[in-house]
């Protein structure tokens, strides 16, 4: 059973919470201060969830310290990460927020790819 943590400002403006990603994004920003790139807006929850799927490791977990809202090539980012950051981890509040976010996006979209990715996590 998924726990939904959607934030709402109006009935038409429902988005999954991004608060669980703040620690990892903060660490990403510390490591990549000079990097300039586009970022998804919170209302682009499908694109953010697709990012989560793109970064998901074969064991179902995720690397740490990623800007999940970044419009970046996931393969290039993963290749540039130090080995210890590529591995799946629970460090820096990692993995549980991804599962929760994917579950919330599944509840909003009924798209099984988000449910399947959450279950793999």
Task: Label the predicted regions.
Residues 1, 20-23, 74:
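Short hydrophobic/aromatic-rich motifs at helix boundaries and adjacent loops
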Residues 1-13:
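Bacterial Sec-dependent N-terminal signal peptides
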Residues 13-24, 34-41, 80-95:
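Solvent-exposed loop and edge beta-strand segments that line ligand/cofactor-binding
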Residues 24-40, 48, 53-54, 96-111:
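Well-ordered alpha-helical scaffold segments within catalytic/enzyme domains
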Residues 56-121:
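Extended ligand-binding groove/face enriched in aromatic
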